[in-house]
């Protein structure tokens, strides 16, 4: 799988700050994905290993007592139309592939 990332998001994954990747669709199994970093890099620069898939609508119920969490989850669902989050298990930087 090939996933595209903005440079700032790539850096958050690389540093370990970002622990979930949110998307509209994800397979329901752990995956390895090559990371394409968009402009100005425009290259494949890493590999990310994604683990368990979480359904954001389930999180709405799980975190219903935490208004801050519910607000963030709603933003992902309503603004970005994301349905899933996958745990970022591991990151591996590679040589740039242009």
Roles of regions detected by a PLM:
Residues 1-98:
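Structured alpha/beta reader/binder surfaces that contact nucleic acids or chromatin modification marks
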């Amino acid at each position: 799988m090939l996933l595209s990332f903005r440079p700032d998001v790539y850096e958050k994954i690389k540093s370990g700050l970002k622990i979930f990747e949110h998307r509209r669709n994800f397979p329901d199994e752990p995956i390895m994905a090559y990371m394409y970093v968009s402009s100005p890099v425009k290259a494949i620069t890493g590999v990310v290993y994604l683990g368990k898939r979480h359904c954001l609508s389930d999180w709405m119920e799980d975190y219903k007592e935490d208004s801050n969490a519910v607000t963030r989850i709603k933003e992902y669902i309503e603004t970005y139309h994301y349905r899933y989050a996958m745990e970022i298990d591991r990151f591996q930087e590679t040589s740039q592939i242009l």
